[in-house]
Amino acid sequence: MAAVDRSRTEISVLSDRVTDVGSVDFPGYYFDEDNIWDLDKFKKNLKVSITSLDQETMVFEISGIDASIANAFRRILIAEIPTLAFEFVYIINNTSIIQDEVLSHRIGLVPISADPDMFKWFQHPLPGQEATHTDYDTVVFSLNKKCEFNKNAATDEKDPKRLYVNSEVYSGDLIWKPQGRQEERFADNPIRVVNPDIVVAKLRPGQEIDLEAHAILGIGQDHAKFSPVATASYRLLPTIHILSPIEGEDAVKFQKCFPKGVIELEEGPDGKKQARVADVRKDTVSRECLRHPEFADKVQLGRVRDHYLFSVESTGIMKPDVLFIKSIAVLKSKCLAVKSSLQNISSD
């Protein structure tokens, strides 16, 4: 591919700078070319493929979209998909070393496994009014732990976990208390904390924690505890163009400039080792090869402008593929809202 053609589809990565970073697919950028956005062309170019998927993480590729759309998906995944999290903590007794507000904050960050589509938004009361909770907008958990000496512990025991009973309070100690018809509605998939092994507090004999926590719907834009993802990120697909053969010892040196699996060595026509690109997706674009003058005119690095490698790591509240589908629905609703507003402006 000619250099001028690459500038249309790729970002050039040089030793000291990055060039061709601006979008070029709009009318007027190239002389005598019609680059008007076309829906059929967009559908043809749009491609999505899942690389790996399990209960917590998903890696997938999406191409044929602008960076603004890719970033919109990332931001929606982080901040705009509704989930349940603890919002109200009513402390009955807390004689631990952790202050009430710190304990409440730690409990608030514990992820809850509950389908948010089964709940309504909680209506916060006006100043001076009392909150009204229902079984359709609130989930109630209780925690009651008291630390005592273990009567069966050895006299020379030093391990607090054996010396005491309930020396540590875990997220799994939060017990769901069904309200109204919740037990019936969630009979097949009871509400629970995602990870029961999160340490919430440590106790010593005589110390006690007794509280009730209420969870409601929210979004990460309001507080990070509502965010359904631990990470949601993307990077552009790297490109490595070998302009002229790299052989012999140079090929071995060239291979070492990249992470394992990016460059492979094969036997060339003359029997010498020759470098070839094996898997660009493993490249971190460190530009190490550009530090060596012998490769300056033999390789060109870049990134495909509209090809994104997405990585989504769920907190366990929902599967990552479900989260991405929900992000599409949120973006669609935003577009419909803008469309409706524009129609109202035009009608006025």
Curated annotation (Swiss-Prot):
Disulphide bonds in the chain: none
GO biological process terms on file: transcription by RNA polymerase I; transcription by RNA polymerase III; transcription elongation by RNA polymerase I
UniProt entry tagged with the keyword Repressor: no
SMART domains: RPOLD
Subcellular location: Nucleus
Predominant location category: nucleus
Gene3D superfamilies xref list: DNA-directed RNA polymerase, insert domain (2.170.120.12), RNA polymerase, RBP11-like subunit (3.30.1360.10)
InterPro entries in the record: DNA-dir_RNA_pol_30-40kDasu_CS, DNA-dir_RNA_pol_insert, DNA-dir_RNA_pol_RpoA/D/Rpb3, RBP11-like, RNAP_Rpo3/Rpb3/RPAC1, RNAPI/III_AC40, RNApol_insert_sf, Rpo3/RPB3_RNA_Pol_subunit
GO MF annotation, one: DNA-directed RNA polymerase activity
Any one GO cellular component localisation term in the record: RNA polymerase I complex
Classification via CDD domains: RNAP_I_II_AC40
Entry keyword annotation includes Transport: no
Keywords: DNA-directed RNA polymerase, Nucleotidyltransferase, Nucleus, Transcription, Transferase
Subunit record text: Component of the RNA polymerase I (Pol I) and RNA polymerase III (Pol III) complexes consisting of at least 13 and 17 subunits, respectively. Interacts with RPAC19/RPAC2.
Family, similarity comment: Belongs to the archaeal Rpo3/eukaryotic RPB3 RNA polymerase subunit family.
Function, as annotated: DNA-dependent RNA polymerase catalyzes the transcription of DNA into RNA using the four ribonucleoside triphosphates as substrates. Common component of RNA polymerases I and III which synthesize ribosomal RNA precursors and small RNAs, such as 5S rRNA and tRNAs, respectively. RPAC1 is part of the Pol core element with the central large cleft and probably a clamp element that moves to open and close the cleft.
Protein name listed in UniProt: DNA-directed RNA polymerases I and III subunit RPAC1
Organism annotation: Schizosaccharomyces pombe (strain 972 / ATCC 24843)
Gene: rpc40
